[in-house]
Amino acid sequence: MNSTHHHGMYTSLHLWNRSSHGLHGNASESLGKGHSDGGCYEQLFVSPEVFVTLGVISLLENILVIVAIAKNKNLHSPMYFFICSLAVADMLVSVSNGSETIVITLLNSTDTDAQSFTVNIDNVIDSVICSSLLASICSLLSIAVDRYFTIFYALQYHNIMTVRRVGIIISCIWAACTVSGVLFIIYSDSSAVIICLITMFFTMLVLMASLYVHMFLMARLHIKRIAVLPGTGTIRQGANMKGAITLTILIGVFVVCWAPFFLHLLFYISCPQNPYCVCFMSHFNLYLILIMCNAVIDPLIYALRSQELRKTFKEIICFYPLGGICELPGRY
């Protein structure tokens, strides 16, 4: 087994390794046909320590988000419950990827034949990662629908999005995504699974784009209608628009971090022997790093966009003996 194949194992996902393994074969074929033998065909190596470090950072950040939302009753709203679901999904994707890197590195450093055990561990962790990816997509869609209701059905919103209903939605999301993730890994040898994942990703983008075009085109009209009513409708509507903008940023980061991976899958099933596709697929490990970066960036977005969340973060952090961090100015 050559070194590049060992490096490819750090990416691990059984479903995703399948495309990585195919990459080496296709690269060899391309080289055999006379193409340049530049480093573009070599699988990009990323140190396992990078995966582990990002996994630990993501774990700490997203736990902080979950604890903050649970602790502060002012954050007990549908949007933040969906954000909590997204934080759990982000954390599982990043931590599972880092954990699998550790497991494979340890197994590769031993002389014993642990191939069967490695495959079983891969399947379990890959199921978690796949389920979490689906949950991330569904959570983002749920937040988008929630923002849509707050803007277009502001007066009926609290009757539509009750805490009980939100809890049922989140439970159904995770139940469906868990079953789907397990099935995807079981049938990961089929190209239909990859096509299904790619279709889900791009369908999500189309739905989001359609929703936001309608949302922002009509938002001003609804703001004007709410403004003529007594009370604090204008203030409430402004807060709702801020939430919609926050979601826009989250979706933008999600697309930037996940699109290269889905393009990798798309190229694998559409042009696996094309030298340009092979060159793009040789950076597979980098695309996994981008995925883990998404889990690290999202909590920072929550904090930057929510003063209430920043305040709760500080209260939680100051609970621990972290030196003079509590002496920082109250203003962010």
UniProtKB/Swiss-Prot annotation:
Residues 70-81, 146-165, 216-248, 305-332 are cytoplasmic. One of its GO terms (biological process) is response to insulin. Its main location: membrane. Keywords: Calcium, Cell membrane, Disulfide bond, G-protein coupled receptor, Glycoprotein, Lipoprotein, Membrane, Metal-binding, Palmitate, Receptor, Transducer, Transmembrane, Transmembrane helix. Brain, enriched in the striatum, nucleus accumbens, and periaqueductal gray. Glycans are attached at residues 2, 17, 26. Disulfide bonds join 40-279, 271-277. The chain crosses the membrane at residues 44-69, 82-106, 124-145, 166-186, 192-215, 249-271, 281-304. It is found in: Cell membrane. Hormone receptor that acts as a key component of the leptin-melanocortin pathway at the intersection of homeostatic maintenance of energetic state. Plays a role in regulating food intake: activation by a stimulating hormone such as anorexigenic alpha-melanocyte stimulating hormone (alpha-MSH) inhibits appetite, whereas binding to a natural antagonist like Agouti-related protein/AGRP promotes appetite. G-protein-coupled receptor that activates conventional Galphas signaling leading to induction of anorexogenic signaling in the hypothalamus to result in negative energy balance. This is Melanocortin receptor 4. It comes from Rattus norvegicus (Rat).
